[in-house]
Amino acid sequence: MADSKELAEQREETRLIIEELLEDGSDPDALYAIEHHISCENFETLEKAAVEVFKLGYEVTEPEEIEIESGEILVCFDAVSESGLNAELIDAQVEQLMNLAEKMGVYYDGWGTYFEDPDAEYDDEDGENEDDESESDKSSRLH
């Protein structure tokens, strides 16, 4: 079971992220892609965790390597769900994924999402923003 102190820290972080998004003018009624970050030193271990995360109903992104401040290389993926900015729902996801991470021997590294412009125009068929926004523009808004 996830450490209660770490869970409390994550709950506080969740509320801070939501507060900052709303203060910045993000759409309070939008559906957000909630990206939970999972990492590990070992690809095989990470792959097993990704399978379990997928079984829980999350979309799992392709694994990629990242270098952390110490110079160590980790492999990571995101477990993605779509929801409103509901702190209790996100808390439940965080706890679920922290427990799984502990069980599988991987790290839960928090979550993030993107600013949702309340004035953006969306294509009715696929919900994609009609504005031509590059991936680099989007990544700069990750909270």
From Swiss-Prot:
InterPro entries the UniProt entry points to: RraB, RraB-like_sf, RraB_dom
Location (main, coarse): cytoplasm
Disulfide bonds: none
Protein's cellular compartments: Cytoplasm
Keyword terms: Cytoplasm
Cited Pfam families: RraB
Any single GO CC term annotated in Swiss-Prot or TrEMBL for this entry: cytoplasm
Positions of transmembrane segments: none
Record-level Gene Ontology MF annotations: endoribonuclease inhibitor activity; enzyme binding
Residue span of region Disordered: 117-143
Superkingdom of source: Bacteria
Acidic residues composition bias: residue spans: 117-135
NCBIfam families recorded: PRK11191.1 (NF008393)
Protein function: Globally modulates RNA abundance by binding to RNase E (Rne) and regulating its endonucleolytic activity. Can modulate Rne action in a substrate-dependent manner by altering the composition of the degradosome.
Record text on subunit structure and interactions: Interacts with the C-terminal region of Rne.
Recorded family membership: Belongs to the RraB family.
Protein name, per record: Regulator of ribonuclease activity B
Organism the protein comes from: Proteus mirabilis (strain HI4320)
Gene of this entry: rraB
